[in-house]
UniProtKB/Swiss-Prot annotation:
It catalyses: dUMP + (6R)-5,10-methylene-5,6,7,8-tetrahydrofolate + NADPH + H(+) = dTMP + (6S)-5,6,7,8-tetrahydrofolate + NADP(+). This is Flavin-dependent thymidylate synthase. HAMAP family: ThyX. The keyword Cell division does not apply. CDD domains: ThyX (cd20175). Its EC number is 2.1.1.148. It comes from Thermus thermophilus (strain ATCC BAA-163 / DSM 7039 / HB27). Its cofactor is FAD. Belongs to the thymidylate synthase ThyX family.
Length: 270
């Protein structure tokens, strides 16, 4: 792998690619375990990776692993660590004196009216931002004062707010990394963690372009349909109309057949 790739995020944060094991070829090799790497072309590799993604064959994607160094506000890290399939190691406030680095948004957001856990629209309130900075200064001042009085680092840190920056290493396989990106790139994800997801997506797209294309097509921009939703579609479409629409978008052969069967079932598809 080439030198470290670092992308700035928020006002003081970043995402840095530390290491990578495997790439698109590792996915293909795992899927063709009986034959080894072989002499397949990039086009054939892309078709195989696309097949694996749309049929939810996940284990070949687990053969690719990324390790990132991340600097993010504590409240972002706590959301991040809800994804429990990764290996994580975070800077310790028991062993280190934490730096006076706080995330300060350009503007606050209003509480969403329809979603209790979301926000919407900018709240341009200089008094609110001034209050945030006041709390930061007082909290960090109290932290340093406690340390000077001999209070243990593991206890002095209790006064620090959630917008303090933390750093951690995060190692994740590609299958679960795609799941992270599917959730954290979504519009309903908190804005701050979406910025980190976008930075990671930029790196992943560059490093495994064939896998990213399949992820984007089938998971990121795709959707699952319930039984009720399928019934509604079948009531609005005929196989002939749907086939014509799919063909106009470039689908043909087995891909066209699969798409028809997905909506109308194997007994009804053309």
């Amino acid at each position: 792998m080439e030198g470290p790739l670092t992308i700035p995020v928020l006002d003081k944060g970043f995402v840095r690619l530390v290491d990578q094991m495997g790439d698109d070829r590792a996915i293909v090799q795992a899927a063709r375990v009986s034959y080894g790497e072989g002499t397949k072309t990039v086009r054939e590799d892309a078709a195989l990776i696309d097949y694996l993604m749309r049929h939810r064959h996940t284990s070949p994607f687990e053969m690719v692993v990324f390790k990132f160094h991340v600097k993010a506000p504590i409240f972002v890290a706590r959301q991040w660590f809800r994804h429990r399939t990764a290996s994580v190691n975070e800077i310790s406030g028991r062993y280190s004196i934490l730096k006076e680095e706080f995330y300060e948004p350009e503007a606050f957001r209003k509480q969403a009216k329809r979603n209790k856990q979301a926000s919407e629209g900018a709240l341009l309130d200089e008094e609110a931002l001034a209050l945030l900075r006041k709390v930061e200064q007082e909290a960090y001042g109290a932290y340093r004062a406690l340390l000077e009085k001999g209070v243990a680092r593991e206890m002095a840190r209790m006064v620090l707010p959630l917008n303090l920056y933390t750093e951690f290493y995060w190692k994740q396989d590609l299958h679960n990394l795609f799941h992270f990106l599917k959730l954290r790139l979504a519009p309903e994800a908190q804005w701050e963690i979406r910025q980190y997801a976008r930075a990671i997506a930029e790196i992943v797209k560059e490093r495994v372009p064939l896998a990213w294309a399949a992820f984007e097509e089938h998971l990121l921009e795709g959707a699952f349909l319930s039984r009720t939703e399928l019934r509604a579609l079948r009531g609005l479409l005929t196989p002939e109309v749907y086939e014509k629409a799919l063909s106009s978008l470039g689908l043909g052969g087995s891909r066209l057949k699969e798409a028809l069967e997905k909506v109308f079932g194997p007994g009804e598809a053309l």
